[in-house]
């Protein structure tokens, strides 16, 4: 039997399948788009094409669009699934920072169990959407934004509100501030917000999941801000789906 996890996030929909030992045997990702129902149908189409919707396979759905997965056997909160996925990827103890499209989560794990968590889901500042908006204003991709920031000198973006921060960036552009300096200010703003949420992780292993886990410069900056080496891996983007799959498979 395989366990199948479907994580319908605000930006991307992820699918993972694991075997009885918790090893990932399939993963898939697609933009969520406008409709969670359409995202769930796209995930189902992938699973059917891959031959993974056998009757003896269990499906667990998570993420903000989890209730749109009509073929799921169970729905589980994203905090529980991200904790379970991170424990499987990195180990049972530590702090997990998940930067999503519309929220940021910090999850404390002990013996593979979520002990507490913090979530910023009221404001886009410190999220992937914030970076996306700022990159658009600078006419670059998110990866190009990080490359620019690496060679830039920090300029202060003081607002914690995305709308006001966007106005600050527009003003800096108008004043002729070098683009790389603005990019560095944007990265520093995000890292500062996330590090503030994770201030209670001192002395713990810290792991990064979500869409920023492939952004090396942000990982470096976050490691510096937290005075530790923030660890991640190529599968960390799928942590929520992997956690859901592990629950579906009954993996401890």
Put a short name on every predicted segment.
Residues 3-38, 42-45, 114-117, 121-122:
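Short glycine-rich, Thr/Ser-proximal phosphate-binding strand/loop in the N-terminal lobe
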Residues 44-57, 194-205:
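Phosphate/pyrophosphate-binding loops at sites that engage ATP/ADP/AMP, CoA/4′-phosphopantetheine
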Residues 130-132, 233-252:
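Glycine-rich phosphate-binding/hydrolytic loop that grips phosphoryl groups
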Residues 65-116, 243-248:
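Conserved phosphate-binding catalytic cores of ATP/NTP-utilizing and phosphoryl-transfer enzymes
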Residues 162-202, 237:
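Adenine-nucleotide phosphate-binding core of ATP-dependent small-molecule kinases
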Residues 111-157, 161:
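Glycine-rich phosphate-binding loop plus the immediately following alpha-helix
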Residues 64, 198-225, 236-240:
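Glycine-rich phosphate-binding loops at beta-strand->alpha-helix junctions
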Residues 20, 29-32, 48-80, 115-116:
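Short beta-strand-loop/turn "lid" adjacent to the catalytic site in phosphate-handling enzymes
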């Amino acid at each position: 039997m395989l366990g199948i996890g479907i994580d319908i996030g605000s930006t991307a929909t992820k699918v993972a399948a694991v075997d009885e030992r918790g090893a990932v045997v399939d993963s898939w990702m697609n933009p969520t788009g406008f409709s969670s129902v359409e995202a769930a149908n796209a995930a189902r189409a992938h699973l059917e094409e891959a031959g993974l919707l056998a009757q003896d396979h269990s499906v667990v759905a998570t993420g903000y669009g989890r209730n749109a997965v009509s073929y799921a056997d169970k729905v589980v909160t994203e905090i529980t699934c991200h904790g379970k996925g991170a424990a499987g990827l990195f180990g049972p103890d530590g702090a997990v920072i998940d930067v999503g499209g519309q929220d940021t989560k910090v999850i404390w794990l002990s013996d593979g169990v979520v002990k507490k968590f913090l979530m910023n889901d009221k404001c886009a500042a410190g999220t992937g959407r914030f970076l996306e908006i700022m990159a658009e204003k600078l006419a670059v991709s998110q990866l190009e934004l990080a490359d620019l920031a690496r060679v830039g000198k920090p300029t202060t973006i003081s607002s914690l509100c995305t709308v006001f921060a966007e106005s600050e960036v527009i003003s800096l552009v108008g004043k002729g501030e070098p683009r790389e300096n603005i990019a560095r200010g944007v990265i520093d703003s995000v890292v500062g917000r996330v590090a503030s949420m994770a201030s209670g992780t001192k002395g713990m292993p810290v792991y990064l999941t979500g869409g920023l886990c492939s952004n090396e410069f942000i990982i470096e900056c976050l490691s510096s801000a937290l005075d530790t080496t923030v660890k991640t891996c190529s599968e960390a983007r799928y942590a929520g789906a992997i956690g859901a799959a592990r629950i579906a498979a009954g993996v401890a």
